[in-house]
Regions:
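Active-site-proximal C-terminal subdomain of hydrolase catalytic domains
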Residues: 95-185
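Catalytic-core segments of thiol-dependent peptidases
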Residues: 2-106
Length: 185
């Protein structure tokens, strides 16, 4: 089962999650579970070890936040502690931090948000976990999704503008398929 969790409550996230839920149900017949912070206690307790949990938020190499001003934000350790307190199963093996630059090093001596989150989760007893971070500006909204160039594949994919640190591109701001620019820890 796929779970989409937005750890900050706002109308933009709610509408994007609802759009994703309806789209996937129509296309695949499988309805993912989508929820926001105010529903997290209810839904995180349902996640099983084989499930995939997407954390959907605005972000940068330092943290994830609510909107572009990050007045309400979480560090990797704060996010890990929040999931632990909400009783996320320690059997989970796949969490994807779908936020901008979550897989890019913060600095030469400080690992990426995704790697620091994985380390925080390991310290809380999540031993089977693989965490995915993304290497650029990600797009979750279906309005900004792209299609693969293959004629037979009309699915709209999560998009990403790769960070210049990762990929030098002659076409500035060209959007690629997000799964092409991710890193796993």
């Amino acid at each position: 089962m796929i779970y989409y969790y937005a750890p900050f409550d706002d109308d933009e996230n709610f509408l994007e999650l609802l759009d994703e839920k309806l789209f996937l149900k129509e296309k695949t017949g499988v309805e993912p579970v989508t929820f926001m912070s105010n529903q997290a206690e209810k839904y995180l307790s349902l996640v099983k070890g084989c499930d995939r949990l997407y954390i959907i938020a605005h972000g940068d190499t330092n943290g994830i936040g609510h909107g572009l001003n990050y007045n309400n934000s979480l560090t990797p350790t704060q996010l890990a502690n929040k999931l632990f307190k909400l009783k996320l199963t320690k059997e989970i093996s796949d969490i994807r931090i779908f936020s901008c630059d979550s897989g890019i090093k913060h600095s030469i001596h400080i690992p990426s948000f995704a790697q620091r989150f994985k380390e925080a989760m390991l310290s809380l007893g999540y031993k089977k976990l693989m965490v995915t971070g993304y290497l650029g500006q990600v797009y979750f909204s279906r309005d900004n999704r792209i299609t693969k160039s293959f004629k037979l594949d009309k699915r709209r994919r999560k998009g990403i503008i790769p960070s210049p640190e990762v990929f030098r591109n002659s076409l500035e701001n060209e959007i690629f398929i997000a799964s092409q620019f991710k890193v796993k820890f």
